[in-house]
Amino acid sequence: MDKTKIKYLVGIYAAAMCIMGMLVPVPIVASVAAAFPNENIAAVQMIIGIIPLMMALSAMLVSSQLASRVSKKKTTLVGHVIVMLAGASVLVFHDSLGQVLAASAVMGLGLGAVQNSTDALIADYFGGKQRSFVMGIYSTFVALGGIIWTMVSGILGSAEWFHSYAAYFIMIIFIVIEAVCLPEGHLEPKRKVNVF
């Protein structure tokens, strides 16, 4: 593998480590429930469940439609900035569960864009057995990211539950790595038939 592709992988794997950023609230779900005792526990659990996942799916559909006009690198970076800002917003806006759920929804949009575009970058630059190998390592970095985000979140949230969301500021490091290392990616051909 040449140096250029190794550089691309550094950017792709940096993005992969942030895909599980939606797990930041996992260690503090009980504390969030205690902070909003009048809210249904199922609603509290939505900060890590259905809301960010559904929004991620929506973002994947939209980003694949934009792939003929917007580079995959830009999609990844914009998605990642959205995740960071939405997550960090809970440090300020945490007076109601609705605010936390709204932040989770916006994070889901960003995460969907990041995942879809990084998967597509792998397809653009790696083929055959090399692609299978790269995807296997990619999955490892996604899992490693999940471990890191939950560990950092648990430490930060030990005093106040919403302090866990400061973990999203760590993403600045990954965004810089992506900006330096990610390739633009190939624009997808415009589709004549609308899949919707």
Residue ranges and their predicted role:
Residues I137-L182:
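Helix-loop-helix hairpin linking two adjacent transmembrane segments in secondary transporters
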Residues D2-P27, V195-F196:
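Pair of pore-lining "gating" transmembrane helices in MFS-fold secondary transporters
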Residues A105-F141:
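Cytoplasmic helix-loop-helix junction between adjacent transmembrane helices
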Residues I28-L57:
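Extracellular/periplasmic helix-loop-helix junction of adjacent transmembrane segments
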Residues L23, I51-L61, G146-I147:
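Residue-level signature of mid-helix packing/kink "hotspots" within the transmembrane helices
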Residues A15, P52, Q130, M135-A143, ...:
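Small-residue-rich transmembrane alpha-helices and their cytosolic helix-loop interfaces
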Residues L57-H94:
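Conserved MFS/SLC helix-loop-helix module at the cytosolic interface between two early adjacent transmembrane helices
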Residues G98-V106:
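Paired small-residue
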